[in-house]
């Protein structure tokens, strides 16, 4: 790769820059350019019905300025503008914005298209960059300024002839980031001299990174330079229009706001020419997650995705910030464990949202908690236990969680795929709950040996290897007594390490579930669970499940030993 064919971008000489120490404290003025900049970048541009639907959705979100197109560019663009105006699509508090070049026939057609609207921004632009001037237009700086001033005067005169509309004027030095900064300030000030903004009639100076050419801090330097050098700054709305060619359109916009800008033009999901525009969803939610009202409604992200994908035939990437299908998903075991603990803490104290790996509460944008933790071979106990707890009301003891996590991630590895909540639950049931072979409890009865029920006597009928046995024993509680009664039959000592239980929160019939952790003579741990409408029965069934796992493990070892001896 011949990297020497490229040259680095020149840095801006800006002494005592202030933007690095500033922070964004409020939402900017937003302008959606989905229907113009976004639409012109589509393989198949939107038709009239799609545009109308998209416009209505942008209004619903709270946009107060919407760039609807370039009405002089085509009959389709002109018809869309007239339809919005004549059929009453534009609310009283919403301003439509249209684009025009600095040519009199185009400006005249633009004002004709706007006839009858209450509020409109007329957006004038011409290319100012060194490359565009020298290669495309072959204009001098003076000729470039003359073109901008000509358009500014024509727009001002036509606005005076249409007093029924409240016009705002906007000027963009296209390819601003490739323009010499002193010249950018000069041409903008020449336009400002024509329009003569006031406190009540401000002018928008839009500073686009038409092609993103440098790091975001360079754009911020350029914006701060312009804010310092624009005439009548207090009557100017400085606007940003960042593209994403280097992948930093959002960052450049945020730094541009820190540098003094007041307004942002962008699109939903960053749709736009080449690699796209600055993503207003991304920008707005970045504000929201810092405790700042974005002044736009992102509460139903799924509807936004649906409208966007149907209208543009583009897909939202599964990793797209805030919106993608995998944004609120953790496969990693350590991440899952941290999320589980964070969610548990949120249930106890919730003044601020603070959950590891989740900078946003999914419910705030209409997402659910269900897909937060998803299980594959990289997952661990935290993820498995979170899903079983959230979906099925199973509060599994900590050491039991480790064993279940190992079993279920091994299953996922074997299947070579992610597994869902229902499948996780089925694996858990099959592996641990109410296991009845080779040992089965047919019936039992208990009685207290002392008045405090500390010492309990149990009689039971069990079936082991297809044979029935009647057993009895005493123990420190029902579970201990039952384990003591089985020692002679199964030929193993059994130690109870942990026993817990709770009522199940899943299903129409109330049930109890018990969890048992047992230890054999060599110190190996085994886990089982049992369910019943009776707490006592559920605990004994849990013991049977754990013992069956112990027996089956021993049988597997014995078979392995026999095979080694034969070999």
From Swiss-Prot:
Q: Which Gene3D superfamilies match?
A: 3.30.160.270, Aldolase class I
Q: Where is it localised? A: Cytoplasm
Function of the protein? Catalyzes the condensation of the acetyl group of acetyl-CoA with 3-methyl-2-oxobutanoate (2-ketoisovalerate) to form 3-carboxy-3-hydroxy-4-methylpentanoate (2-isopropylmalate).
Write the record's keywords in alphabetical order, separated by commas.
Amino-acid biosynthesis, Branched-chain amino acid biosynthesis, Cytoplasm, Leucine biosynthesis, Magnesium, Metal-binding, Transferase
Principal location class: cytoplasm
Question: Any one cellular component term from GO for this entry?
Answer: cytoplasm
Q: What is the E.C. number?
A: 2.3.3.13
Identify the gene encoding this protein. leuA
Q: What is this protein called?
A: 2-isopropylmalate synthase
Q: Where is this region: Regulatory domain?
A: 435-567
């Amino acid at each position: 790769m011949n990297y020497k064919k490229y040259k680095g971008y020149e840095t801006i000489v800006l002494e005592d820059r202030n933007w690095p120490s500033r922070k964004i404290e409020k939402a900017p003025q937003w302008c959606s350019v989905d229907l113009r900049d976004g639409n012109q970048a589509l393989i198949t541009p939107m038709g009239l019905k799609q545009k109308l639907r998209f416009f209505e959705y942008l209004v619903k979100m709270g946009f107060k300025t919407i760039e609807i197109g370039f009405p002089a560019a085509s009959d389709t663009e002109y018809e869309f503008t007239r339809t919005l105006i004549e059929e009453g699509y534009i609310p009283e508090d919403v301003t439509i914005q249209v684009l025009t070049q600095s040519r009199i026939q185009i400006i005249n057609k633009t004002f004709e298209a706007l006839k009858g609207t209450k509020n409109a921004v007329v957006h004038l632009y011409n290319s100012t960059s060194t490359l565009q001037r020298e290669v495309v237009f072959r204009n001098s700086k003076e000729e470039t300024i003359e073109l901008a001033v000509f358009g500014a005067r024509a727009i001002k005169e036509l606005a005076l002839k249409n007093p029924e509309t409240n016009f705002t004027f906007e000027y963009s030095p296209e390819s601003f980031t490739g323009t010499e900064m002193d010249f950018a300030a000069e041409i903008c000030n020449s336009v400002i001299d024509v329009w003569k903004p006031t406190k009540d009639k401000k002018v928008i100076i839009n500073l686009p990174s038409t092609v993103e050419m440098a790091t975001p801090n360079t754009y911020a330097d350029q914006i701060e330079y312009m804010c310092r050098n624009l005439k009548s700054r207090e009557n100017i709305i400085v606007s940003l229009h960042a593209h994403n060619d280097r992948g930093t359109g959002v960052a450049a916009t945020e730094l541009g706001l820190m540098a003094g800008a007041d307004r942002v033009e962008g699109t939903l999901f960053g749709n736009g020419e080449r690699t796209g525009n600055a993503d207003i969803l991304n920008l707005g939610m970045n504000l929201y997650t810092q405790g700042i009202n974005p002044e736009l409604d992102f509460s139903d992200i799924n509807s936004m995705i649906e409208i966007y994908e149907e209208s543009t035939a583009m897909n939202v990437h599964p990793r797209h910030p805030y919106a993608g299908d995998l944004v609120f998903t953790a496969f990693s075991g350590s991440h899952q464990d941290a999320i589980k603990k964070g969610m548990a803490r949120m249930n106890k104290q919730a003044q601020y949202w603070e959950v590891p790996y989740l900078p946003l509460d999914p419910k705030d944008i209409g997402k659910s908690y269900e897909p937060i933790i998803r299980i594959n071979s990289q997952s661990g106990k935290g993820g498995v236990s979170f899903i079983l707890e959230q979906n099925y009301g199973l509060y599994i003891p900590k050491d039991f969680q480790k064993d279940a996590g190992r079993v279920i991630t091994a299953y996922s590895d074997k299947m070579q795929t992610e597994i869902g909540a229902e499948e996780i639950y089925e694996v858990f049931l099959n592996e641990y709950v109410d296991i009845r072979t080779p040992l089965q409890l047919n019936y039992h009865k208990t009685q207290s040996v002392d008045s405090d029920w500390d010492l309990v006597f149990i009689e039971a009928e069990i079936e082991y290897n297809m044979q029935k046995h009647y057993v009895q024993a005493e123990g420190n509680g029902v579970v201990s007594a039952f384990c003591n009664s089985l020692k002679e039959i199964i030929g193993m000592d059994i130690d109870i390490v942990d026993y817990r239980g709770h009522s199940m929160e899943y299903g129409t019939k109330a049930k109890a579930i018990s969890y048992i952790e047992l230890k054999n003579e060599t110190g190996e741990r085994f886990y089982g669970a049992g369910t019943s409408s009776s707490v006592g029965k559920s605990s004994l069934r849990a013991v049977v499940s754990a013992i069956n796992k112990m027996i089956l493990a021993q049988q597997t070892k014995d078979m392995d030993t026999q095979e080694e001896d034969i070999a």
